[in-house]
């Protein structure tokens, strides 16, 4: 039991350190309002466009929440590992994040790609209610 506990702690620490090294998971990166070229450059350096941090945010959610250019968001959604039904922080979908941010272009794109408009997050909150609660 003790060995299992330490193994879990060790693996968790490795995951945490790895996530912290991914530029695309750093809040400061998104606060700088990066261009599509900058994001592509970071990916070419080995930064994962689909990895999640410890809070289950990924580059797509971070880009949406920081109101980054829709060209960047569209590009990230197309990357391997980023499917429209991917569960993120609190099991929220990209559609919930985009609706809450008031990003109608991305909302339409996600619906066109098959995102479930009736999906509920881990709190049982549907897309429309989450969008309304976000203002």
Can you name each region flagged by the protein language model?
Residues 1-25:
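Bacterial Sec-dependent N-terminal signal peptides
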Residues 18-44:
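Sec-dependent signal peptide cleavage junction
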Residues 21-30, 51-64, 85-97, 119-130:
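Ankyrin-repeat boundary/"N-cap" motif
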Residues 30-31, 43-44, 64-65, 77-78, ...:
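Ankyrin-repeat helical core positions
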Residues 34, 67-68, 102, 135:
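Ankyrin-repeat intra-repeat helix-capping/turn positions
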Residues 38, 68-72, 105-106:
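Conserved ankyrin/ankyrin-like repeat signature
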Residues 40-48, 74-83, 108-116:
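Ankyrin repeat domain, specifically the short helix-to-loop turn at the C-terminus of the second helix
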Residues 103-114, 120-124, 132:
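N-terminal adaptor/linker regions at the entrance to substrate-recognition repeat cores
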């Amino acid at each position: 039991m003790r060995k299992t506990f330490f193994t879990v702690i060790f693996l968790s620490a490795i995951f945490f350190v790895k996530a912290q090294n991914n530029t695309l998971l750093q809040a400061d990166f998104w606060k700088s309002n990066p261009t599509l070229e900058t994001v592509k450059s970071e990916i070419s350096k080995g930064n994962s466009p689909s990895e999640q941090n410890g809070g289950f945010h990924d580059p797509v959610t971070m880009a949406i929440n920081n109101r980054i250019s829709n060209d960047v968001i569209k590009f990230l959604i197309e990357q391997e590992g980023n499917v429209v039904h991917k569960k993120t922080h609190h099991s929220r979908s990209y559609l919930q994040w985009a609706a809450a941010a008031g990003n109608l272009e991305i909302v339409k794109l996600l619906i066109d790609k098959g995102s479930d408009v009736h999906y509920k997050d881990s709190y049982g909150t549907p897309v429309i209610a989450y969008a309304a609660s976000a203002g």
